[in-house]
Structures are given as C-alpha cells and as structure tokens.
C-alpha cells in the first residue's frame, strides 16, 4: 500500500511553494564560502535540479556514484536534515523544507521518501526538531512535512503531535483568523492528524488552543452583525472550506463520547448555534457535518446525553428548526436520514419535558431570563422539593451564578443585570418556601452578595435584592 498523501487544497499555500521554487539558491557559492558543507549543498542542488528544474541528468547520481535513475534514500535525505540543523541561512532552510515537501507530494518519489523515515523513525524526530521555526512560510511548509509523515503507518508518534500542539509559531498562525489563508492551512493539518484515532486524546488535551478559533470561524458564518461575515455561497470560497474543515475536525473529535460531553459543557452556546448554520448554509457538506456532530453529542454513549437533548429543545429551539429542515429537498440521502433521526430523538424527549427541565436547562446555560417558570407561583410550589435534593445542589448552583456575576461580571451590562434580577427573584422564592435554605446562603456567603446589591444603580436589581433581604430577615427573626 502506498504512502498517504495530504492534498493541501490551498491556493495560497501552493503559491508560497511556487514562489520558493522560482528562486534559485547559489548552492555552489554557499559551499565555497563554507556556509554549507559540500555534501549538503551538492545534495540540495541536485534535488532542486531534479524536482524543480526537472533535469534528471544533473549531479546527484554522479556525485554519489549511483546509476542515472535517481532514487530517494539516506544519501538524499540525511544531508538535507543535516543542513537544516546546521545552517543559519533562512532562505536555504526554507528552500530545503520545500524540497522535502516536493518529495512527499511526488507521485514518483513520495513512497520512497516515506519508506526512508519508516525504516529509520529517529530521522522523523530529527526533522521535527529543525521544523516549525523561521518565518510563517517556513513554519507552514515544515508543518506540512512533519504532519505528512506523522499520518503514515509506522510513523505514528503521539509525543511529536503534542510537541506540535505546543509550538507557538504554528498555533499563533492557526489562531489568527484575520489571515484566513494561513489559518486554513493549520486547521487542515490539525484535521489530518485527528483522522488518526491514536492522536485524538492528545489533540483534545490542547483543545483550548484551537476550539475557540474553530467556533469563531463558524460564528462569522452565522452572525449577520459582523462586517466580516462569511457568506455561504455556491462557490468553493475559502470561507466555506474553513467552515467545512473546522466542522470536520470537531466531528472527528466527538467520536469520543467523553470529548463530546465536554464540548457541549464548555461550548454550549456555540454548539447550539450549529443549527443556525444549517439553516443558512446551502452547502450540504456543511449541513451534514453540523447534524452529525449534534447526533454524536446526543448519543446514548455520551454522559448526560439527555441533558444535551433538553438543552437543544429548550435553549436552541431545535424542534421547529429540525422540522423545517426535514421538509427541505436535500440530495444527500445520508443527510436526510440524519435529520430524520435527530427529529425523532427530539420529539421523544419533548414528550417527557417538564417546566423544571426548562428551568434547569436555563440555569445550566447561565443565561437566566424572565421566562415563565420564574414568575409562576405554581411552578415554585410544585417543584420546591427539587431545590433541596443532593444537599441543595440546584439552590447552590443558583447562588454560585449570582456570586459569579456580582464578583466577576460587569454588573451594569444589560444582560448581566437581567441575570442578577432573575437570580435574586428565584432565591426569594426558595427562601420563602424553604426557610432552612437560609443556612445555605449563610455558609456560601450568598447573603452578603445580596446585601451588596441593595446599593445597585439599577432599580429592578435593587428591588429584587430588597425582596430577597426581606425574605431572609423575616425568617431569621421569626
């Protein structure tokens, strides 16, 4: 079986390589000045002649006393790695990294190049140590080289993948979505690594370095307020490719049910927005991945999958959206089936929903608003015992949310003020119906935070804080 080739469908990346190809390096002069060793320079020169100038009869075969049919082996690659580790000439090193990329991309020489590293995996470590350095062009090309090798059978190396994820040069390029062309190359490389199940644990371990960027790319596709919105057109626009490969990377990682659960918990709002993207995109490949990610996060293998489904229903308004999608005439049979499966999952869970489920989903989202349960006295009398369960778990969660907003948030921001108002209202209801909950308020320090809000500039916050204080004091002195 031949080597796996990464097809880097990036015009920008290919243009960078084309420009490097067009610039000849004075290999002989560098050898004469002893900037490079003679063997390193002659090897690079001969390879350039064969791969770039397409002149098979040039010097490598004669200098190595080999036959005229050029073959890749240790005599070809070891001098290149040696040059990269010893030279201070950045143009030379960029050119050599590009020559290695030419070998790996070549139908004629690619298999032999990979075979050399498979027979001597230590050489991959040597190459890695001299890669991902220099300007952004060299970082991208050398990144392409090491990833092209790391995905090959016999060359899997989790430690090197972790080193790659810790490389600030590569991560900085990935995180800069203003430079979409170069960001795209890095996401493609990471996505290629994620195809290998063996690498997914270490990739997820470093998810904070790339997941926010992936969701920012997807957010730009759905946020009509952004001047930089990436419009879902019919063309193979770079923006569409960025969306697709960002989603593909997320999808590959959510095959692991633990990662799927953590993704929803850490990025709930972004997860819910996947349905928004399905609504506006006309690219079925984008829709298919969005729906597949949602299905994997709703799988019974995922811890708290029922909670995820409830969040989709209550916070993501998923059921009417999916019902609407099910009426579209998609050509992709797999997509139509996935939408049907998701619709069935949502409908089954919807039958079992209660107003308390709605309340908990809202509390979990940390985005409290004046939805019906908060102002329905019947809701509180019917469900007050739920707030006592598990050592007042839900009540403590409510107090923690209030404290987080008071101590760390912008208490004057419009949305923050609403969250504080609603949290105070709910605490009042609990205290009135469960006077013993005042002990929990005391022990958590929540009472002091409520008192502090008596001086808030917003009249509704002040009013709700006063109600809560009166409820606390009323029972304290009974």
UniProtKB/Swiss-Prot annotation:
Signal peptide extent: none
Disulfide bonds listed in the record: none
Gene Ontology MF terms: proton-transporting ATPase activity, rotational mechanism
One BP annotation, GO: vacuolar acidification
Record membrane topology: Peripheral membrane protein
Gene3D superfamilies given in the database record: Leucine-rich Repeat Variant, V-type ATPase, subunit H, C-terminal domain
Keywords, in A-Z order: Hydrogen ion transport, Ion transport, Membrane, Transport, Vacuole
Compartment(s) of residence: Vacuole membrane
GO CC annotation terms, alphabetical: fungal-type vacuole membrane; Golgi membrane; proton-transporting V-type ATPase complex; vacuolar proton-transporting V-type ATPase complex; vacuolar proton-transporting V-type ATPase, V1 domain
Reported phenotype of the disruption mutant: Increases the ATPase activity of membrane-detached V-ATPase V1. Abolishes growth at pH 7.5 and in the presence of calcium chloride, abrogates growth at pH 5.0.
Chief location bin: membrane
Stated role: Subunit of the V1 complex of vacuolar(H+)-ATPase (V-ATPase), a multisubunit enzyme composed of a peripheral complex (V1) that hydrolyzes ATP and a membrane integral complex (V0) that translocates protons. V-ATPase is responsible for acidifying and maintaining the pH of intracellular compartments. This subunit is essential for activity, but not assembly, of the enzyme complex. This subunit is also required for silencing the ATPase activity of V-ATPase when V1 is detached from V0.
Similarity section: Belongs to the V-ATPase H subunit family.
Other remarks on this protein: Present with 22500 molecules/cell in log phase SD medium.
Subunit structure comment from the entry: V-ATPase is a heteromultimeric enzyme composed of a peripheral catalytic V1 complex (components A to H) attached to an integral membrane V0 proton pore complex (components: a, c, c', c'', d, e, f and VOA1). Interacts with YND1.
Name of this protein: V-type proton ATPase subunit H
High-level lineage: Eukaryota, Fungi, Dikarya, Ascomycota, Saccharomycotina
């Amino acid at each position: 079986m031949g080597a796996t080739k990464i097809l880097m469908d990036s015009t920008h990346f290919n243009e960078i390589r084309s420009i490097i190809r067009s610039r000849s390096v004075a290999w002989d002069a560098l050898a004469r000045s002893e900037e490079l060793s003679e063997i390193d320079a002659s090897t690079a020169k001969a390879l350039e002649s064969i791969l770039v100038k397409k002149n098979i009869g040039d010097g490598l075969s004669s200098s190595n006393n080999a036959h005229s049919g050029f073959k890749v082996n240790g005599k070809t690659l070891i001098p290149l790695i040696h040059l990269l580790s010893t030279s201070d000439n950045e143009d030379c090193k960029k050119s050599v990294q590009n020559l290695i990329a030419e070998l790996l991309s070549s139908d004629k020489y690619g298999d032999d190049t990979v075979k050399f590293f498979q027979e001597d995996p230590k050489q991959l470590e040597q190459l890695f140590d001299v890669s991902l350095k220099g300007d952004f062009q060299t970082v991208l090309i050398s990144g392409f080289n090491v990833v092209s090798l790391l995905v090959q059978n016999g060359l899997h190396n989790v430690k090197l993948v972790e080193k790659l994820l810790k490389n600030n040069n590569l991560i900085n390029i990935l995180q800069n979505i203003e430079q979409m062309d170069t960001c795209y190359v890095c996401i493609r490389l990471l996505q290629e690594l994620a195809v290998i199940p063996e690498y997914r644990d270490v990739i997820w371990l470093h998810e904070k370095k790339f997941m926010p960027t992936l969701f920012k790319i997807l957010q730009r596709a759905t946020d009509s307020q952004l001047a930089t919105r990436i419009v879902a057109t019919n063309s193979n626009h770079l923006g569409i490719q960025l969306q697709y490969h960002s989603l593909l990377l997320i999808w590959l990682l959510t095959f692991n049910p633990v990662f799927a659960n953590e993704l929803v918990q850490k990025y709930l709002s972004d997860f819910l927005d996947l349905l928004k993207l399905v609504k506006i995109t006309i690219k079925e490949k984008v829709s298919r991945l969005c729906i597949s990610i949602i299905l994997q996060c709703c799988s019974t293998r995922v811890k708290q999958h029922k909670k995820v489904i409830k969040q989709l229903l209550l916070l993501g308004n998923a059921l009417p959206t999916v019902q609407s999608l099910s009426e579209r005439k998609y050509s992709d049979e797999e997509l139509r089936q996935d939408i049907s499966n998701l619709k069935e999952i949502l409908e089954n869970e919807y039958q079992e929903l209660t107003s308390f489920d709605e309340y908990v989903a809202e509390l979990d989202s940390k985005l409290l608003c004046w939805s019906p349960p908060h102002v329905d006295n019947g809701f509180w009398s019917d469900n007050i015992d739920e707030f006592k369960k598990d050592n007042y778990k839900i009540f403590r969660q409510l107090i923690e949310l209030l404290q987080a907003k008071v101590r760390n948030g912008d208490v004057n921001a419009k949305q923050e003020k609403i969250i504080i108002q609603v949290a105070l209202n709910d605490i009042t209801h609990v205290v009135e119906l469960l006077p013993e909950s005042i002990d929990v308020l005391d022990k958590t320090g929540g009472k002091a935070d409520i008192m502090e809000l008596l001086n808030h500039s917003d009249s509704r916050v002040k009013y709700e804080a006063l109600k809560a204080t009166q409820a606390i004091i009323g029972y304290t002195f009974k």
